[in-house]
């Protein structure tokens, strides 16, 4: 028994010892639990921090990064996914209230697929998100949103596919051209050297121009899928390829001559597509590249060519209206309006269908924008395809168009509603609704515009799209001008419209004046926004589409007209003057060449301001002489009522021409066709002397307390002879097309295009099969055994460059854009201003044709040393088998 008890006691004590050891070991294991540091967790690598504590782990010490132990740390991609889910949940709760049950179910299915798709949170995209967050914090202090007091936030509410023309980071709230993300990769920029006619571009030149287009121009109209790359775009559509290069050359230093020559060639290609196209419904990069192929990509070329048309000096020569009409009809011809459902195009793949739908939406956007800017009825078709793409951002059956393009389509549709509502009376001469209906309709449209603005602001409205929204607001409120009676009810001084009206002659005096104050404030806010974009990025104005510059000019005319009217005392004149001066600076800096439309508009705006100021002073003097009874309204009506939302702009130009006596001037110029060049030069010198005297007089009268901004305002708005100044500007149109004399060509000769420098008609098959200049040089060296008389004949028939040897430029090695810039740099360093950098030289083109007009032949006939005379002599000698060099 004792032994048994001893055994029991021994076993109990042993069990107690084993339990205590187990507890001790458990506590030791609990204390020695391994924790990986944050960096090793993120990289999913083995960590020895528990062994080296308190020293950093081996990997952190090697990378020289802090070794942090955090118990509740989770990897970044999970946190990014959870944040995206949370943001999408908040957006759904805010937006689902306006959708039907079917749309809600469809939207939920789409969102589930997006959230549960692990490919949306790969390491590459996480790195991009990190980089974007870092760049956002860097540029936040100088972003334009901070000027408006709005926070900057990154939005992940958009789906981004590889085929989207905008990259992942392009959906940020701010438009930041300095840190633009529309950058093409090196693989996308790879392209073989290409040539069109006598224009040759190397691979580096093509890459540079495509990058220029992607970073500077693509943001205004994201219609082209640049992810295809330059080489593939060329095989799909050579026309689109060369249009992109032409647009990229607009601001390249030292490439003005190259841009001019390429513009002529591109113009001929587009005209060939318009007249005799080859239709391809499903183009492929495996097809042979042909210039005159009409497809979805040629429509994109016309859209880009419409937004950035060739440079002209007047609105009448602008090609935007013609090219957008061609683009719309061509889009219908290739079936873009029914690409999503028609059995005829069922063979097209999904990528091509998405391309077609996006292009069709852009056609309607650009067509409405051009029509609203010129005051013409728009040819648009906001059909089911366009409307469904606007309303349902993530529909499976539709293309995932960029958010920027969707917002542009919404604004364009509202502009179309304005025209259809306010100009929908066939019984009226102008199509305008009656006076009783006008005021209520304007109130309804204004409320609809406010709702649209709120909706767009919630969906990350950037600066470019807000620019278009403010333009639409100005277009809507401009209809208040048409409430005023016509000019027959006011005073007139001969052919000069004074625009004076009685208060009793106003249909709805109070509402009309209230609306005019609204349109004044809207125009001021629009110009303030445009100037803020310029201050945020001084280079953005250089890449503005031509329509944007025209919108700035039109809003400035509204401000000038209302400041110099009887509503002067009711307006914020100081802000209006500042906005007007900013508009002059904006248009001047938007100029590409001297005497283009932007350059001339800045000068015309100065004349319009001084003209209205003189008229306003004369009206005030008349009121004072009448005893101080201000019984009349002044400058509140318009004469031009056929241009819809831009009636005021064309009415201002009409008043300017009336004041300048342009009608009389045109009659005088028809009678007298010859002029003395010496007298014209003397007049120019006298005018320059008057300008210098005027500036000296203004500077001598400057008060001591006037700052530079006020001094610039005074110089801009004080013109001594506005009528004379405006007449000179209106006469100067060197960039407009030259008239083609109908009797100057024979049936067998080739016509040159207006303002052309190319004499021969383009052979499209020859262009595609044309050898490069280096190959032509080698080929010419191999053919050196040709007889002398044949060489002489070819030399005679070939146009000779002015001021150079008879060697043709095609036989010389090509110069890259960088080399041309280096050659141009010494000549232009002395003259850095716009006026001196791009002088307009009214000389003969680079190449002269054999078929000249009679006037040009007679102009140099008395000069016996001219090439014209001896060239004809050489032709006669060759005809009679005489060698002129023997």
From Swiss-Prot:
The 9aaTAD motif is a transactivation domain present in a large number of yeast and animal transcription factors. It is found in: Nucleus. Gene3D superfamilies: Zn(2)-C6 fungal-type DNA-binding domain. The gene is LEU3. Present with 125 molecules/cell in log phase SD medium. SMART domains: GAL4. Residues 1-28, 673-709, 734-756 are annotated as: Disordered. This is Regulatory protein LEU3. The lineage of its organism: Eukaryota, Fungi, Dikarya, Ascomycota, Saccharomycotina. Residues 8-17 have a biased composition (Polar residues). A motif (9aaTAD) lies at residues 874-882. Pfam families: Zn_clus. InterPro entries: prtT (IPR051089), Zn2-C6_fun-type_DNA-bd_sf (IPR036864), Zn2Cys6_DnaBD (IPR001138). Its main location: nucleus. Keywords: Activator, Amino-acid biosynthesis, Branched-chain amino acid biosynthesis, DNA-binding, Leucine biosynthesis, Metal-binding, Nucleus, Transcription, Transcription regulation, Zinc. CDD domains: fungal_TF_MHR, GAL4. The keyword Protein biosynthesis does not apply.
């Amino acid at each position: 028994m004792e032994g048994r008890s001893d055994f029991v006691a021994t076993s109990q004590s042993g069990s107690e010892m084993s339990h205590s050891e187990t507890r001790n070991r458990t506590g030791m294991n609990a204390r020695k639990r391994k924790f990986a540091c944050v960096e090793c967790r993120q990289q999913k690598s083995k960590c020895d921090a528990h062994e080296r504590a308190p020293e950093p782990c081996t990997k952190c010490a090697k990378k020289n990064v802090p070794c942090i132990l955090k118990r509740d740390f989770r990897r970044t991609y999970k946190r990014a996914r959870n944040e995206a889910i949370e943001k999408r949940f908040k957006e759904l709760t805010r937006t689902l209230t306006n959708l039907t049950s079917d749309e809600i179910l469809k939207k939920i299915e789409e969102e589930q697929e997006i959230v549960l798709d692990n490919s949306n949170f790969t390491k590459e995209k996480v790195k991009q998100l990190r980089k974007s967050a870092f760049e956002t914090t860097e540029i936040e202090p100088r972003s334009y949103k901070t000027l408006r007091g709005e926070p900057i936030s990154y939005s992940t509410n958009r789906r981004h596919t590889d085929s989207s023309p905008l990259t992942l980071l392009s959906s940020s709230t701010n438009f930041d051209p300095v840190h633009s993300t529309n950058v093409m990769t090196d693989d996308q920029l790879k392209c073989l050297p290409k040539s069109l006619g006598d224009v040759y571009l190397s691979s580096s030149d093509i890459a540079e121009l495509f990058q220029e287009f992607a970073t500077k121009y693509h943001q205004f109209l994201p219609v082209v899928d640049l992810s295809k790359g330059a080489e593939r775009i060329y095989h799909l559509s050579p026309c689109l390829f060369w249009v992109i290069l032409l647009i990229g050359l607009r601001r390249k230093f030292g490439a003005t001559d190259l841009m001019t020559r390429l513009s002529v060639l591109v113009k001929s290609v587009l005209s060939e597509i318009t007249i005799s196209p080859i239709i391809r419904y499903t183009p492929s990069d495996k097809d042979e590249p042909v210039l005159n192929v009409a497809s979805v990509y040629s429509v994109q070329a016309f859209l880009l060519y419409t937004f950035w048309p060739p440079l002209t000096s007047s609105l009448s020569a602008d090609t935007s209206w013609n090219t957008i009409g061609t683009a719309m009809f061509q889009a219908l011809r290739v079936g873009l309006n029914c690409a999503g459902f028609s059995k005829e195009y069922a063979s097209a793949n999904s990528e091509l269908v998405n391309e077609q739908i996006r292009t069709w939406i852009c056609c309607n956007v650009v067509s409405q924008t051009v029509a609203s800017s010129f005051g013409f009825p728009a040819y648009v078709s906001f059909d089911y395809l366009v409307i469904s793409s606007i309303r349902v951002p993530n529909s499976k059956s539709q293309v995932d168009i960029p958010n920027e393009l969707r917002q542009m389509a919404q604004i364009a549709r509202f502009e179309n509603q304005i025209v259809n509502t306010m100009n929908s009376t066939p019984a009226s001469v102008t199509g305008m609704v009656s006076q009783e209906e006008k005021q209520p309709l304007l109130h309804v449209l204004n409320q609809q515009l406010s709702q649209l603005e709120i909706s767009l602001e919630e969906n990350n409205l950037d600066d470019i799209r807000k620019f278009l929204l403010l333009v639409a607001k100005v277009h809507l409120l401009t209809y208040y001008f048409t409430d005023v009676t016509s000019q027959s009810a006011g005073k007139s001084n001969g052919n000069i419209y004074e625009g004076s009206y009685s208060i009793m002659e106003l249909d709805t005096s109070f509402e009309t004046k209230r609306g005019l104050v609204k349109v004044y404030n809207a125009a001021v806010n629009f110009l303030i926004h445009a100037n803020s974009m310029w201050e945020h990025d001084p280079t953005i104005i250089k890449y503005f589409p031509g329509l944007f510059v025209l919108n700035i000019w039109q809003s400035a005319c509204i401000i000038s007209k209302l400041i110099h009217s009887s509503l002067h005392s009711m307006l914020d004149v100081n802000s209006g003057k500042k906005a007007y001066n900013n508009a002059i600076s904006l248009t001047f800096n938007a100029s590409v060449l001297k005497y283009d439309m932007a350059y001339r508009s800045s000068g015309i705006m100065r004349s319009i301001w001084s003209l209205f100021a003189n008229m306003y002073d004369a009206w005030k003097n008349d009121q004072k002489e009448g005893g101080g009874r201000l019984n009349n309204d002044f400058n509140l009506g318009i004469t031009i009522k056929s241009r819809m939302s831009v009636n005021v702009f064309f009415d201002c130009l009409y008043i300017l021409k009336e004041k300048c006596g342009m009608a009389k001037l045109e009659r005088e110029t028809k009678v007298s066709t010859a002029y003395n060049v010496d007298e014209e030069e003397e007049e120019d010198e006298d005018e320059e002397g008057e300008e210098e005297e005027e500036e000296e007089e203004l500077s001598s009268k400057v008060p001591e307390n006037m700052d530079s901004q006020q001094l610039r305002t005074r110089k801009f708005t004080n013109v001594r002879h506005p009528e004379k100044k405006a007449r000179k500007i209106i006469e100067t149109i060197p960039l407009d097309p030259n008239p083609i004399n109908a009797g100057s060509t024979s049936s067998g000769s080739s016509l040159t295009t207006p303002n052309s420098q190319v004499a021969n008609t383009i052979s499209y098959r020859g262009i595609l099969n044309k050898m490069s200049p280096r190959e032509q040089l080698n080929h010419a060296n191999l053919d050196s055994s040709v007889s002398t008389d044949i060489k002489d004949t070819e030399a005679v028939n070939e146009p000779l460059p002015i001021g150079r040897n008879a060697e043709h430029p095609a036989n010389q090695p090509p110069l890259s854009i960088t080399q041309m810039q280096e050659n141009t740099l010494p000549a232009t360093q002395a003259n850095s201003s716009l006026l001196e950098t791009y002088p307009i030289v009214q000389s003969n083109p680079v190449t002269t044709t054999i078929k000249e007009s009679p006037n040009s032949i007679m102009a140099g006939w008395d000069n016996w040393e001219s090439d014209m005379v001896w060239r004809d002599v050489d032709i006669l000698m060759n005809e009679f088998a005489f060698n002129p060099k023997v």
